[in-house]
Amino acid sequence: MRADNQNPSFTNVTLTKSTKSLGSKAVKLYASTAQDLMTWQQRQIRAIMSTNKNGEWKYSKYCIALSRRNGKGEVLAARELYALIYLNEKICHTAHRTTTSHDAFNRLYTLLKKAGYEEHSKKKKDMPEKSFYASKQYGLEHIEVTGGGVIDFRTRTNNGGLGEGFDLLVIDE
């Protein structure tokens, strides 16, 4: 890793000491997988997952605009990992290219394993805690955490996801 400044020039997120956020918990969970987030990534997670005084998400839409291969995917993975395990969210992770979607699936799959979750080859009603089921079919990847959330990885099409409800829509470019 390079030792010089790793902060993107776009970072203008305002977080005060009174800002409530689940982001610190997500960063801690991510760190339990032996992965580290850079300071700017941690700041983005805290902003994305900040809540208002009623405990609702502060931002219904959030965008990180960076060029390719600058660490956006790790921010998304940290958010998705926490959502699957603790928020029981139904997530749709979309990308323009199948390879991008597949890479995101592999990243999250690996993080779950590193977090101590055991994969089961078949979805069963009585799967133990800290386990998950994953469908690895290329282009139709899917992860379901026992007692937790679900995430579908897709490419964008004219009718993909129509009629379905998701708690979180991730548009990965």
Give each language-model segment a name.
Residues 1-173:
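Phosphate/NTP-binding elements of NTP-utilizing enzymes
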